[in-house]
Amino acid sequence: VQKGRKAMLQETWATVTYGLYDNRKIRRLKKFPPALVENRMLFETNDDFTDNGRALFDYLIEKGYNKKYEIVWLVHEPSKYKEYQFENVKFVQNFKKGSTIRRAEAYKYALTSKYIFYTQAFNWIGMSRRNQLFIDLWHGCGYKANKNGRKVFFDYCLVPGDIFIKTKMEFFGCTSKKLLSFGYPRYDMMLKGSERADEYKKKLLKETDSEKLILWMPTYRHASSERLNEETLNNEFNIPIIDDADKLLELNKFCKENHILI
């Protein structure tokens, strides 16, 4: 009950302060936007500091691009990321505490950044500035329809390869010129590998008498968090293909016989 009351008070306070301060400031920022900062990059990911945005950020830091560019992250709680505050790197609170209401400061950085990188959609800004570049790093490339027909705004969007261009043209309703088949930064990170990952893989294969490791990350799945649910699956295990225990045992038998670990 106390948690519920606290959340309700936070939401109420966020709404009040938005009406008194943020809303007016946002309107003014949009009407009289400050000058673009030519060397400012802005990052936002669906879950803070993750996905393709995080992988690209790590690469930029590794190569020293933060010496030339200011890199700003929009996150829920900036204090969580103190260890990543390298030279010219800043973490800015995106939402008012305990709410889904964006702060005026988030708009300020969105309206003044020359380059904006994101992984979902950035429609909330409601406008784009001349000479701003909106680059959608996106978060996956499954063959699924754009069910709600929403428009995702960008100047360019990454896809893993040429084979995805046609399907993403249909999904986003854009031309092929806007789709860059450079691959995803997180794929580069995964393929680069690490010594720890190699050691763990060897350990798993040895323990299970396996020769091959398959990492299965189904898009259509049921999750404990409603926000992460992609589809409602009506089967025993809430994952695709494996509808019941018999199919699971059949797959397990096949894997054992062929020394495969999933």
Q: What are the residue ranges of the model-derived segments?
A:
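Membrane-proximal basic amphipathic "stem/tether" segments
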Residues: 1-38
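Short intrinsically disordered, low-complexity coil segments enriched in acidic
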Residues: 2-4, 150-154, 218, 236-237
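Generic detector of solvent-exposed, compositionally biased contiguous segments
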Residues: 14, 19-22, 185-194
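Short, flexible helical or helix-coil boundary motifs
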Residues: 20-24, 64, 258
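A short, compositionally biased domain-edge/stem linker segment
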Residues: 22-32, 121-122, 198-203
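Active-site and donor-binding regions of nucleotide-sugar-utilizing enzymes
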Residues: 37-193
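Conserved catalytic-core segment of nucleotide-activated headgroup transferases in glycan assembly
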Residues: 51-59, 188-262
